[in-house]
């Protein structure tokens, strides 16, 4: 895949450069981040997004806190509060804590987290490519822009295309932030993969017509039974795929599994500003003063999953047993 990475670290400058994903695909603009406070705001504002990419960014946020002389407890608190649903954020910050007060150790650990993301996603892509075929539908954005590596669901799709297994991709636009239209379409175009953009409401009709052979999505947080949170709209796709007898897969690094959660009932769901629903890039699309509701994620019950694609292979039901084994909890 011709990757456009969401960030880069300029160690000599003490600056973490973030690709402002709000401005894609029209502009590729990198913005400088010099403190943990700025990193937390960038994550909250979705300059960077996607669970693995948020985790890497948060880790480097703690490096920046050392460089800027910020209070480390406060920096950690701000970063944890930036996006509550993606568990990678918390895992990364937990790993950085033993290196508080140690700049060199902190930088080494942040780089290690980033390298592990790349290695893990290369494996996810290989495993996922073996089970995808024909025409695949995906939701939101799960490529390098969302991860800092090779991508999860999108990485598997691109690898499956390279192997001649997938011939075409249906891309949900993913309202209201349009990650599918702005980011997934952008990445697939760069990778040379044949794809077509659809509105979210078209998915069921495509399935009914036999135009979808499989659905694969990413994961922001998964419980031990396989219930998972992903971009809002995922649950509806899972129900539709189940109704039409279409395989439905979730692709994720095992770091996105929260071993503290027995089911999806305990996953916190971020609610974002209603303004993101009624307006986009300064253009209002609903009457002034009209109310809107904006949960950023929904939870899909594990019963709708055909399989879970991880760096250790593809897991099949019963998912609780497979996930516990993969995590080394048994």
Swiss-Prot record:
Pfam families from the UniProt entry: IF-2B (PF01008)
EC number(s) per entry: 5.3.1.23
GO BP annotations listed: L-methionine salvage from methylthioadenosine
PANTHER family noted in UniProt: METHYLTHIORIBOSE-1-PHOSPHATE ISOMERASE
GO molecular function, one term: S-methyl-5-thioribose-1-phosphate isomerase activity
Catalytic-site annotation from UniProt: 220 (proton donor)
Family as reported in the entry's similarity comment: Belongs to the eIF-2B alpha/beta/delta subunits family. MtnA subfamily.
Name the UniProt record assigns to this protein: Methylthioribose-1-phosphate isomerase
Function noted in UniProt: Catalyzes the interconversion of methylthioribose-1-phosphate (MTR-1-P) into methylthioribulose-1-phosphate (MTRu-1-P).
Keywords: Amino-acid biosynthesis, Isomerase, Methionine biosynthesis
InterPro entries recorded: IF-2B-related, IF-M1Pi, IF_2B-like_C, Initiation_fac_2B_a/b/d, M1Pi_N, NagB/RpiA_transferase-like
Site (Transition state stabilizer) location in chain: 140
Superkingdom of origin: Bacteria
Pathway note: Amino-acid biosynthesis; L-methionine biosynthesis via salvage pathway; L-methionine from S-methyl-5-thio-alpha-D-ribose 1-phosphate: step 1/6
Catalytic activity, as annotated: 5-(methylsulfanyl)-alpha-D-ribose 1-phosphate = 5-(methylsulfanyl)-D-ribulose 1-phosphate
Binding positions for substrate per the UniProt entry: 49-51, 83, 179, 230-231
UniProt gene name: mtnA
NCBIfam families (UniProt xref): eIF-2B_rel (TIGR00524), PRK05720.1 (NF004326), salvage_mtnA (TIGR00512)
Keyword Amino-acid biosynthesis: yes
